[in-house]
């Protein structure tokens, strides 16, 4: 398996430090609002990477943090007239609602910055002892120039970074590129006791300390959005490697932006859409499928039209699964035939292409294309007139579900309660048609259509599918 490493700017063969376990840290949300689809992209992409690593047999220790204290949190809490903790609790709960809808597995650990203050203070003390940090009236800064490899992730010198960076102007800093590790308390802000007086941690040190606490000094994979390369991830490397004297992360993975009308989506630009809002029109799974339809490092354009295309694509897969479920119930033959064995071998060949795509820097676009190739083969060879065996139907069903599971899609099955209700309505419609009560038959068809049920007459009887 090869992954593109931002640190080396090339694809490299991935082997974890421990041959059986992968240690992975992914930057989570700042919990002051519902997350938008720009935030959702890394959550979905790196959940998919985790799923694939687990599929390959690794135990993945996956840590995703919650930033639950920073300037945005304090500002929003003051606007709402609630505490920062109440705000964080609310939006952490809302995160899990949206994440569950998107099929994002819970992390092994979801640490909150405010619950790891001791670990953060310990790391800052270590940096101070080693001469990488200095205290100015209760504010503690990291000396960027003392870390000689600063800039190695963004592949720029300190001078270049200084010219192009948005830097907090603070005359008390020894160098403009120095950044805050600890911020002295301001009136009305939450604060914790520390050797430098009451205050709160800086953003960058939170991730370094939590990764160190839960995964150790050197981890296999650190991931996040492209916008985090500098300064956040650059600063994490500086802090962690200065404190521990060891490489922090062996692989750095970053996803591309989501654009709206050619511009990066961002809360600051006001051109963002929350996942919660989009899910009112499109199913959460459609959003996930949309994200996986492009290579994760490429920019992706957002539009309702593209979401509609994703919906149609996902529906093709589900219709194939529904068809297989239906044929399985009515299959007469048990044993696989020679021609079906040939089909099985062709499907296994396509599965190999799926694996090849995922092994090539998690190329989910090509992996989805492989699933569509399987769907095409199945639809052509296993249908109402093919008299297919239960064995080949079961094999095809399992294969689509297996590969879909790697991507976190196509795992839903028709609800049994819904099945019963629909079957009863279809039976009533059939009875009405026999009695030439066309009015009732049409009314039932219309009702089913409103429920998103499409009817199809087949030699085995009426077949129905859910329009998702």
UniProtKB/Swiss-Prot annotation:
Top enzyme class: ligase
Cofactor(s) the record lists: Zn(2+)
InterPro entries recorded: Cys-tRNA-ligase, Cys-tRNA-synt_Ia_DALR, Cys-tRNA/MSH_ligase, CysS_C, Rossmann-like_a/b/a_fold, tRNA-synt_1_cat_dom, tRNAsynth_Ia_anticodon-bd
EC id: 6.1.1.16
A molecular function GO annotation: cysteine-tRNA ligase activity
Cofactor: binding details: Binds 1 zinc ion per subunit.
Protein name, UniProt field: Cysteine--tRNA ligase
Gene: cysS
């Amino acid at each position: 398996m090869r992954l593109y490493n931002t640190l080396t700017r090339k694809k490299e063969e991935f082997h974890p430090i421990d041959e059986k376990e992968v240690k992975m840290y992914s930057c989570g949300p700042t919990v002051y609002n519902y997350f938008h689809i720009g935030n959702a992209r890394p959550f979905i992409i790196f959940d998919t990477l985790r799923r694939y690593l687990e599929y390959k047999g690794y135990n993945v220790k996956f840590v995703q943090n919650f930033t639950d204290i920073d300037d945005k949190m304090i500002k929003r809490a003051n606007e709402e007239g609630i505490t920062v903790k109440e705000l964080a609790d609310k939006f952490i709960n809302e995160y899990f609602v949206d994440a569950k809808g998107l099929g994002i597995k819970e992390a092994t650990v979801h640490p909150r910055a405010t619950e790891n203050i001791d670990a953060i203070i310990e790391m800052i003390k270590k940096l101070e002892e080693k001469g990488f940090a200095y205290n100015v009236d209760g504010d503690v800064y990291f000396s960027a120039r003392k870390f000689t490899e600063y800039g190695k992730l963004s592949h720029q010198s300190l001078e270049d970074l200084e010219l192009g960076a948005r830097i907090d102007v603070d005359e008390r800093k020894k160098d403009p590129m120095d950044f805050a590790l600890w911020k002295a308390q301001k009136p009305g802000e939450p604060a914790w006791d520390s050797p430098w007086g009451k205050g709160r941690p800086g953003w960058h040190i939170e991730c370094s300390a939590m990764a160190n606490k839960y995964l150790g000094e050197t981890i296999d994979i650190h991931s996040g959005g492209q916008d985090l390369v500098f300064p956040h991830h650059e600063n994490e490397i500086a802090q962690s490697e200065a404190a521990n004297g060891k490489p922090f992360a062996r692989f750095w993975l970053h996803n591309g932006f989501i654009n709206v009308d050619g511009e990066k989506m961002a809360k600051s630009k006001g051109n963002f859409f929350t996942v919660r809002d989009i899910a009112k029109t499109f199913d959460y799974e459609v959003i996930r499928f949309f994200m996986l339809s492009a290579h994760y490092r490429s920019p992706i354009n957002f539009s309702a039209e593209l979401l509609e295309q994703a919906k149609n694509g996902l529906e093709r897969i589900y219709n194939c699964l529904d068809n297989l479920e239906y044929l399985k119930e009515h299959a007469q033959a048990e044993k696989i035939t020679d021609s079906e064995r040939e089909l099985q071998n062709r499907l296994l060949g396509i599965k190999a292409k799926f694996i090849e795509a995922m092994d090539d820097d998690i190329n989910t676009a090509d992996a989805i294309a492989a699933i569509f190739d399987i769907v095409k083969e199945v639809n052509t060879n296993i249908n109402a007139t093919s008299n297919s065996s239960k064995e080949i139907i079961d094999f095809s069903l399992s294969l689509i579900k297996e590969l879909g599971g790697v991507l976190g899609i196509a795992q839903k099955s028709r609800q049994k309660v819904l099945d019963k209700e629909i079957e009863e309505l279809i039976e009533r419609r059939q009875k009405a048609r026999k009695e030439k009560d066309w009015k009732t038959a049409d009314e039932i068809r219309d009702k089913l259509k409103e429920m998103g049920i499409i009817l199809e007459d087949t030699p085995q009887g009426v077949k129905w599918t859910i329009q998702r």
